[in-house]
């Protein structure tokens, strides 16, 4: 008990002092975003017109991770106000049209799931389920890949994997849809199979199954270039999906192999002088090409997160460190108002549409590069969160913290009637604070685990800490387990 108490004091002290230090770069850019973007949704002045958009979701995902890291309620309040602008009490979403079958519209569903898990308010579940319903009807290629949009028939874009699959995975995990995981894995497998260039290992921005688009190679259906942000979307999608993907699923290894091939290719086109990446990844010597902030932030974020979660070896963190240093030196600027701004993000790049975007190098170079584009800002906040996690001291590195699920074995049914372990469990995001406790523990380098059987010398031999919280009685559990030794 004494050893446990001392370690807990050290863990919480480390976390307190980490939070009390000078404001982090993630927090500085988040403060700028909250003060200047989408003001009408959070009651500020000088509102900007807005719509239900993935751009906002990218920023909110960065703010969500910052909230988890700091437990600062300001971040949660901002997330909730941002979504409450759109979500009615009956779960409808303002400006959202499911019949558009636009996969971009799915991304904010991840924030809706968080809000539901924290507050229990049904409107967030209903809104998230609307988005899940869209995926059930989303048009597909012949083999089953999601079309990017209804107005872009037969096309898969790298972007679309980030827009749809992490939400699809989180929803399937939470609401017991095990059959979805094959479908989710196949989206990445098919995208790589069609878009990967064998010579460089890089992935083309888009693939047209019909080969009818002007931008499509008549033999392969691929677009002409390797656009940096598109590959950034794809890498972030892979890592975010793997975070919630079943550990025992047979296709998990396929996804990790795709991730490693992808990052190995990305490493080769990292600019050796700055650590950054070009807008068109493999053409650094083209005069019009430029180092681009959002792609660089995405590669930094996804690679660092993959290392944190154990999907890539620790040696890959060097890629992220070099890239992050480059971003701070080249793209982060403080203005006269004290805002911390991100320069150097291309506002948009796409394929087809009106006016028609032909996927040529000249087209990509024609799009505007702007300050504080939400896609870049959101990716940077996420990247900074990851790099700040890696920079913190890891007092308990490599040790295992086991939580009891035998003496405290309460069960509850979710909204779909599926029974799950309940009350002081690691995933819980509501007021008991256990998800935050778990984050404090993992932020200090430990691993968390759960023991669902009676403790023995054998099943505790690898654990540094074993914790029992609120053991059951018959009021909690009709068949409680009691200690007999």
Predicted regions and their residues:
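Oxyanion-binding "anion nests"
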Residues: 235-284, 288
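Inter-helical turn/loop segments and adjacent helix faces that build the functional surface
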Residues: 171-182, 241-253, 306-314
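Short, surface-exposed patches at the edges or C-terminal ends of soluble domains, predominantly
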Residues: 393-485
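N-terminal, post-signal-peptide region of Sec/Tat-exported proteins
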Residues: 49-86, 422, 428-435, 439-451
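CBM-like carbohydrate-recognition segments
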Residues: 22-57, 66-79, 85-105, 109, ...
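Long, well-ordered core segments of solenoidal/helical folds
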Residues: 22-43, 77-95, 126-145, 178-207, ...
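Solvent-exposed loop/turn segments at secondary-structure junctions
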Residues: 66, 85-86, 241, 284, ...
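Bacterial Sec-dependent N-terminal signal peptides
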Residues: 1-22
């Amino acid at each position: 008990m004494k050893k446990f108490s001392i370690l807990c004091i050290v863990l919480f002290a480390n976390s307190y002092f980490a939070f009390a230090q000078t404001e982090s770069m993630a927090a500085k850019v988040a403060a700028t975003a909250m003060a200047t973007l989408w003001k009408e949704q959070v009651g500020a002045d000088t509102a900007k017109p807005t719509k239900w958009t993935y751009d906002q979701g990218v920023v909110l995902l960065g703010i969500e991770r910052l909230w988890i890291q700091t437990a600062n309620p300001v971040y949660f309040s901002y997330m909730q106000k941002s979504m409450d602008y759109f979500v009615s009490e009956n779960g409808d979403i303002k400006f959202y049209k499911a019949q558009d079958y636009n996969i971009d519209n799915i991304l904010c569903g991840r924030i809706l799931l968080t809000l539901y898990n924290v507050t229990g308010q049904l409107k967030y579940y209903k809104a998230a389920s609307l988005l899940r319903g869209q995926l059930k009807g989303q048009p597909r290629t012949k083999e089953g890949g999601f079309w990017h949009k209804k107005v872009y028939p037969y096309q898969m874009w790298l972007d679309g994997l980030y827009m749809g699959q992490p939400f699809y995975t989180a929803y399937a995990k939470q609401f017991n849809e095990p059959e979805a995981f094959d479908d989710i894995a196949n989206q990445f497998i098919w995208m790589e199979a069609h878009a990967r260039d064998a010579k460089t290992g890089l992935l083309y921005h888009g693939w047209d199954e019909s080969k009818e688009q002007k931008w499509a190679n008549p033999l392969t259906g691929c677009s002409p270039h390797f656009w940096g942000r598109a590959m950034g979307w794809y890498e972030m999608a892979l890592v975010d999906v793997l975070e919630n993907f079943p550990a025992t699923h047979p296709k998990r290894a396929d996804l990790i192999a795709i991730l490693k091939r992808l990052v190995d290719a990305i490493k080769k086109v990292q600019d050796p002088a700055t650590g950054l990446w070009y807008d068109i990844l493999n053409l650094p010597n083209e005069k019009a090409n430029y180092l681009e902030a959002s792609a660089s932030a995405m590669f930094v974020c996804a690679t660092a997160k993959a290392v944190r979660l154990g999907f890539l070896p620790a040696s890959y963190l060097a890629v992220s460190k070099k890239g992050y240093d480059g971003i701070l030196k080249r793209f982060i600027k403080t203005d006269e108002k004290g805002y911390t701004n991100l320069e150097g993000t291309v506002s948009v790049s796409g394929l087809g549409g009106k006016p028609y975007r032909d996927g040529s190098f000249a087209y990509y170079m024609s799009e505007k590069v702007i300050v504080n584009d939400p896609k870049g800002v959101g990716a940077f906040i996420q990247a900074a969160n990851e790099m700040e996690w890696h920079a913190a001291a890891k007092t308990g590195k490599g040790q295992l913290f086991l939580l009891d699920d035998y003496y405290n074995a309460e069960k509850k049914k979710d909204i779909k009637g599926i029974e799950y372990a309940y009350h002081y469990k690691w995933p819980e995001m509501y007021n008991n604070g256990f998800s935050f406790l778990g984050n404090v523990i993992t932020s200090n380098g430990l691993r968390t685990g759960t023991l669902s059987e009676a403790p023995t010398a054998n099943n505790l031999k690898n654990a540094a800490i074993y914790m029992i919280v609120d053991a059951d009685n018959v009021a909690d559990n009709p068949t409680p387990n009691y200690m007999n030794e």
